[in-house]
Amino acid sequence: KEAPDRVRELEQWGAVFDRTPKNLINQRNFGGHTFPRLAHVGDATGLEIIRTLQERGIHEGIDIFMEYTVRHLLKEGDRVTGCVAYTRVDGDFHAFSAKSVVLATGGITRVWSVCSGSWEYTGDGHALALWAGAELRDMEFVQFHPTGMVWPPSVRGILVTEGVRGEGGRLTNSEGSRFMFDYVPEMFAGDHAETIEEADQWVEEVVSGKLATVRRPPELLTRDVVAKAINSEVKAGRGSPHGGAFLDISHRGEEAILKKLPSMHHQFKELAGVDISKEPMEVGPTAHYVMGGVLVDAETQESTVSGLFACGEVASGLHGANRLGGNSLSDLIVFGKRAGEFAAKRASDLAQPTIDDSQVQTAIQEMLAPFTNEGGENPGIIYDLSLIHISEPTRQHW
């Protein structure tokens, strides 16, 4: 109910969403969706939202502390009263007093060697909440996106947007077969095309701005189904040369691709030397999103610890066990706003808490401990050994 208002608010703040010829916000198809629901900015919607919110933050005069890592949450009794952090540039320590704290730290997918998340997706927010006494739930629910880059090794796992399939991208195996027709679960059988002709007609109707009169291609099944299908094809010996599947959008033509998928065109050209307007991409499953996280109140986003709020991927409860594509951004803009509003409302009734020096010193000692330990493991050696294991043939498949 609130997502449309948040999209309009982003537009008022300067976001530029794609428009239809009738000047309505264009909405794209994603896997698992019954209707085209996704307001988008080409294939870089997230970046546009980040840009817009950063500029808004500067306009509002919000203090932004760049390149800080929070290591410890301060508490007074059962409530959170601030945090201790260090700067990644020079290692200085800083303590912050806060009436309310909002965690918006993202996910945990850097736990996997093949993942789509940034280097910061190391579960810091989940750990901070747990150490502060907050309850976590559903941490076993991790989603693997079906289309990450697979070659060269340096870019393995980088996301290939679902928008490619939403714009008509075709998944094929090494034999040239559109294998997704063989993997439609019984519960989805009536919702997806049974023939290539029907699937292609759906694409023609949708890309021309019409309402589809036929069923959607099986490439737009939910992420778990498509990821498992690609994995099955690879294990059966029908994978691409580097252990994935082929995703082809070249039939849409260069003009349409540069208009609708400019970031993907640039990404493959620069990172893999592949022109997606002329040749297929190689893609495979990549760790993408954790549905589990901090248990929060559905209305306020407050955790089980007073004064500690969470929103986005670090929170839980919104996406069940298998998030649909695009819903993470709706989650962010709706519940991010809610978390901020309720955190501010709570803070307005409280006095500024005093920083507990003993807690700060304990946090600093914990941060410095790895530099003073005698014995233990050398993380550099462990990392090198992990690369050796990953390079073995048995570990090249997901």
Q: Where is each model-derived feature located?
A:
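Core beta-strand elements of the Rossmann-like FAD/NAD(P) dinucleotide-binding domain
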Residues: 91-100, 304
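A glycine-rich dinucleotide-binding beta-alpha-beta segment and adjacent secondary-structure elements
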Residues: 71-80, 84-86, 259-315
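An anion/pyrophosphate-binding glycine-rich loop and adjacent beta-alpha core
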Residues: 135-270, 274, 342-348
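Conserved FAD-binding subdomain of flavin-dependent enzymes
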Residues: 1-16, 134-137, 142
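Conserved redox-cofactor binding core of oxidoreductases
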Residues: 6-92, 104, 148-152, 157
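Glycine- and aromatic-enriched mobile tails/lids
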Residues: 9, 15-39, 76-78, 172-192, ...
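Glycine-rich loop(s) and the adjacent beta-strand/alpha-helix scaffold that form part
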Residues: 100-158, 322-342
